[in-house]
A protein has these predicted regions:
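Non-catalytic accessory regions of SAM-dependent methyltransferases
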Residues: 1-40, 46
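Conserved SAM-binding motif I beta-strand of class I
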Residues: 160-165
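Mobile active-site "lid"/loop adjacent to the S-adenosyl-L-methionine
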Residues: 192, 210-240
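Conserved class I S-adenosyl-L-methionine
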Residues: 136-146
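C-terminal catalytic and target-recognition region of SAM-dependent MTase-like enzymes
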Residues: 250-305
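Conserved SAM-binding loop of SAM-dependent methyltransferases across substrates and taxa
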Residues: 147-159
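S-adenosyl-L-methionine
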Residues: 167-213
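Non-catalytic substrate-recognition/targeting regions of SAM-dependent transferases
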Residues: 21, 27, 31-35, 54-122, ...
């Protein structure tokens, strides 16, 4: 089957490889997409027919652009997050380790296709991680840190970081990402706790940061039963975070929630700045060349004054 529009061009593939990146989107269609992680490919699909079509188009596209891959994994995108399952292997050696390593501008990140629905790296945050390295903050607070990829980007530029996430396993993978890049963790803290509980504690201690990352899940539940809904709780989260931001600090406000478009993020950000009695301007990173217009996470950087 000849690949239809939606697949990246060969020159973009070469550009990624030239900059030391082998983790990125390969194709985006209405009912599915394909991503690359090192030598492996991950297909996300909404319908079985979409999966089969993407598999056939992948082989045709790969032959055309001379792209070699080792394995193909696939995962179904259900309507409810609680129904999400880890990807399944559909092509390749089943005896191989489900873990691999992907690179982004020469930084290494661990990928685990058996750890759950998310494999360890969100490729749509690539330009935001690039911005972190460019700004080179001194102290970064990474909320909902997951596998600490933002912190690795900051640490390679000399920052100290605090990483907060409910999952001890995710933070352990974050430590592994530091080790993959030969970054000692002695100046970095990993806190397995509820972000909404940690922020007030840090404020009481007088902690300040010149960069904060707020990329929460659409929904989460702490071991104590407290829930976080991004649509209703993001403003409260941002107001609390602003108490910890230095005067000229930067705060990333980002979400993958389909119900929150970029304009809604702006409205929330303006309200939160006013509530926290802070002033700032908005900054956006360039669009991702491997994503369609408006695709990927919605993100705004607040540059405080």
């Amino acid at each position: 089957m000849k690949p239809k529009s939606g697949w990246i061009e060969a020159n973009l593939l070469r550009d990624f490889e030239a900059e030391g990146t082998d983790a990125h989107r390969l194709c985006t269609l209405e009912d599915g997409w394909v991503e690359r992680f090192g030598c492996d490919v991950l297909i996300t699909f909404k319908r079985v027919l979409a999966r089969e079509r993407l598999i056939q188009e992948l082989y045709s596209w790969a032959s055309t652009v001379r792209f070699e891959f080792r394995r193909i994994f696939a995962r179904f995108l259900p309507r409810k997050n609680e129904e999400r399952e880890a990807p399944g292997l559909i092509f390749g050696d089943a005896a191989e380790n489900l873990q691999t390593i992907a690179t982004e501008r020469h930084l290494k990140f661990g990928i685990d296709f058996g750890a759950g629905y998310s494999v360890g790296l969100f490729v749509d945050q690539r330009e935001n991680r690039r911005y972190v390295r460019y700004i080179a903050p001194k102290r970064l607070l990474n909320c909902f840190a997951y596998t600490c990829t933002f912190s690795v980007s900051a640490a390679c530029a000399g920052a100290t970081t605090i990483n907060v996430d409910l999952s001890k396993k995710s933070l352990a993978r974050g430590r592994e990402n530091f080790a993959l890049n030969s970054l000692p963790t002695i100046d970095h803290r990993f806190i397995a706790d509820d972000v909404m509980a940690v922020l007030p504690r840090l404020a009481r201690k007088g902690e300040k940061f010149d960069m904060l990352i707020l990329d929460p899940p659409t929904f989460s539940r702490s071991p104590g039963g407290k829930t976080f809904h991004v649509e209703s709780d993001f403003e409260t989260l941002l107001v609390s975070a602003l108490e910890l931001a230095e005067r000229d600090g930067r705060v990333l406000v980002s979400t993958n929630c389909s119900a929150l478009r970029e304009h809604a993020l702006e409205v929330m950000a303006r309200y939160s700045l006013k509530a926290a009695r802070r002033a700032g301007i908005f900054h956006r990173q360039p669009p991702l060349p491997d994503f369609p217009v408006g695709g990927g996470a919605r993100s705004i950087w607040l540059i405080l004054r």
